[in-house]
Amino acid sequence: MLTKTIDTEAWSDRYRNEAIDVPGRRVLITNFIGTEQEHDLSEPANCKGFGRVRHFHRRRSTNWLANPLPIDPACRALGMGNAATIRAQVFQNAVCNWRCWYCFVPFNLLNANKRHSSLLTPAELLDLYLADPEPPPMIDLTGGQPDLTPEWVPWMIEELQRRDLTKTVYLWSDDNLSNDYFWRYLTDDQRAAIKGYRNYGRVACFKGIDRKSFAFNTAADPALFDAQFDLFRRFVEFGLDMYAYTTFTTPDLDGSRAALSDFVDRLQRIHPLLPLRTVPLEVTVFTPVQSRIDSRCEAAMANQYVVASYWQEELVRRFGASDFSKNICDVNMK
């Protein structure tokens, strides 16, 4: 784990400069061959090493809550009915401005490492994707932190449109809510293209339930925990199809019940129904995580199950049975 607090603005600026070629419309994409992350892939890397196929499962653990993301939004958009799993073609940008100790990506794949990445255009990525004998119905733009290179999404949308793939491919991206680059660097037309693209969904991750757990998880300034809510609110008010993840790892449980209640309050101040579009993620140990874990991390992984029980209690207190029976896509925040 990092012991010094990350200068998020400085890291964001540095990694953006290394990870995007705006005139050439290229983004720095990880190549998984020969990396530590390759050991955790359920299938060999594809797309000449620049891609991986991920199988999203609604329920991976009997000890944790079901996760309908991105299965339900993708199936709804593509008319695929209900499903327990979905295959996705994953492309991973090679930079991140935070260092979450539980991240399944090795830290040396988050620092614009040119030994394991190359600058590629969306056209080149789609060429690789379409060369697969069975291209998955969904493309997942992940990282890293994709929003250090926010142009990646509208560029990919343009390329999908050019190839007449808009009705057969669902596009998904994630965001760690660490910067305002969506607003700072995209043009009005690019933002409008994202908003107007029917088969696109976006998930953003809240990295803890309070400032203490946030700083512990990310190594970032605790004040940026509050900024996460402001950034998410802007996306909702803009009209994107937004979903949320959250992690419940906290180094101790002192005050955690009250902190969790306040966390849900803050979600509801963005929109009263946002907790129903928020999915807690279970933190487990992937290969790169093993060398980072100390006693505080072990405690945090145990504590997440207690906090998850508080989460369930809060939702039962605030919502009715009819709310819980809804498909997550039918929780309307617009």
Question: How would you describe each model-predicted region?
Answer:
Residues 1-47, 223, 230-334:
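Auxiliary Fe-S-binding modules of radical SAM enzymes
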Residues 13-92, 101, 105-110:
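N-terminal [4Fe-4S]-dependent radical SAM core
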Residues 92, 96-101, 198-204:
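Short coil-to-beta-strand
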Residues 103-115, 215-222:
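Acidic/glycine-enriched edge-of-secondary-structure segments
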Residues 106-139:
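Conserved alpha-helical substructure of the radical SAM core
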Residues 110, 146-147:
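Short strand->helix junction
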Residues 126-130, 147-277:
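Conserved AdoMet/S-adenosylmethionine-binding subsite of the radical SAM
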Residues 141-145:
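Glycine-rich beta-strand-to-loop/alpha-helix junction loops that act as flexible
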